[in-house]
């Protein structure tokens, strides 16, 4: 059963019944490669999350990096302009998990047993464990003018992204299913 504090921040349709049917979404994830849960957070919850993020922003650190879309080492067997070696850039500000208060909505969602059970069923996993890295399990990322998250393939089995504030312009989120591999091999 959803705790009261989560009921107050989740969107209207995300109730106990919704979270009891994680396996219902497995087929959609398998065929589409992505699931989008619109209005997952209520307007009230979103306002609280935005305030939490704004209150922490002064503690954020600036991070910039360059990488190829595979987030792997340069491969000299391919040309520099090959998709395998094309360089992307990311710049952002970040708050690591150790600076996010224990009573934060993000912490409550992350450690919620009912939400974890939902994703276990959805992903057909016997167990999901919280990420033990004290910095990386939950992050708040800020993208100010000129910042960007460069295109890349995720290296994890799955990623959960919670968009707390839309950008004023730009910010196109792109997702392509079944693009990385061809005949069981990475397709450059």
Language model segments and positions:
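Fe(II)/2-oxoglutarate
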Residues: 1-31
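Short amphipathic
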Residues: 35-41
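Short, solvent-exposed beta-strand-terminating loops
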Residues: 50-51, 55-77, 176
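Long, compositionally biased
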Residues: 78-81, 158
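Catalytic core of non-heme Fe(II) oxygenases with the double-stranded beta-helix
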Residues: 98-107, 116-188
């Amino acid at each position: 059963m959803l705790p009261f504090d989560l009921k107050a921040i989740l969107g209207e349709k995300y109730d106990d019944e919704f979270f009891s049917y994680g396996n219902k979404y497995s087929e959609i994830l398998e065929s589409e490669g992505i699931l989008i849960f619109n209005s997952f957070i209520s307007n009230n919850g979103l306002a609280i999350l935005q305030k939490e993020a704004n209150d922490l922003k002064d503690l954020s650190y600036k991070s910039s990096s360059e990488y190829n879309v595979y987030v792997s080492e340069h491969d000299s067997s391919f040309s520099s302009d090959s998709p395998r070696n094309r360089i992307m850039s990311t710049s952002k500000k970040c708050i690591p998990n150790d600076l996010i208060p224990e009573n934060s909505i993000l912490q409550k969602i992350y450690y919620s047993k009912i939400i974890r059970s939902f994703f276990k069923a959805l992903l057909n996993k016997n167990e999901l464990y919280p990420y033990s890295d004290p910095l990386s399990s939950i992050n708040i990322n800020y993208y100010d003018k000129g910042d960007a998250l460069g295109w890349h393939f995720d290296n994890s089995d799955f990623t959960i992204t919670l968009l707390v504030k839309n950008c004023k312009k730009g910010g196109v989120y792109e997702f392509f299913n079944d693009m990385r591999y061809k005949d069981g091999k990475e397709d450059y």
